[in-house]
Regions:
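Short, charged low-complexity linear motifs
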Residues: 60-66
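Hydrophobic structural elements of the Rossmann-like NAD(P)H-binding subdomain
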Residues: 24, 66-69, 79
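Catalytic loop of short-chain dehydrogenase/reductase
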Residues: 6, 12-60, 73
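Structured catalytic cores of enzymes that bind and process phosphorylated ligands/cofactors
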Residues: 4, 20, 46, 78, ...
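Short, contiguous clusters of charged residues that form electrostatic/catalytic patches at enzyme active sites
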Residues: 5-9, 96-99
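C-terminal helical subdomain
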Residues: 68-69, 76, 84-121
Length: 121
């Protein structure tokens, strides 16, 4: 969380100088769905979402587009460790998620702290 805060503060002025810049942050549905044994992860994602939304509100009068993306269930090492035995064939691959994120980035839409669910894109 602190690294994201420092990144925002370091890049804020530069992003504002650009004609049309975008900032994208990866979150998780865990930010709003409390689950047992996921406390630190869920808290960090909830705090990230809140911090990014505050930053978006601070930039509501310029062209800086600020997005939060929930990639959804993705076949990663973290997920395999957390969910052993889960059928990976029903999960998105990281490459599929990345392609959707790239498409989202290139939409001609200014976002002000919206949360985009990759599974719905």
């Amino acid at each position: 969380l602190l690294s994201n805060h420092r990144l925002i503060r370091s890049m804020d002025a530069l992003l504002k100088k650009s004609t049309f810049s975008k900032a994208l942050f990866l979150s998780s549905s865990m930010a709003s769905t409390p689950k047992s044994f996921w406390g630190a992860y869920a808290i960090s994602k909830a705090a990230l979402n809140h911090m990014v939304k505050i930053w978006a509100n601070e930039n509501k009068n310029n062209n800086l587009s600020i997005m939060i993306v929930n990639p959804g269930k993705t076949s990663t090492k973290m997920r395999a460790k957390a969910m052993p035995g889960e059928n990976e064939k029903v999960l998105q691959t990281p490459e599929e998620v990345a392609k959707k994120i790239v498409n989202l980035i290139f939409l001609n839409k200014v976002s002000k702290g919206e949360i985009f669910d990759i599974l719905q894109i």
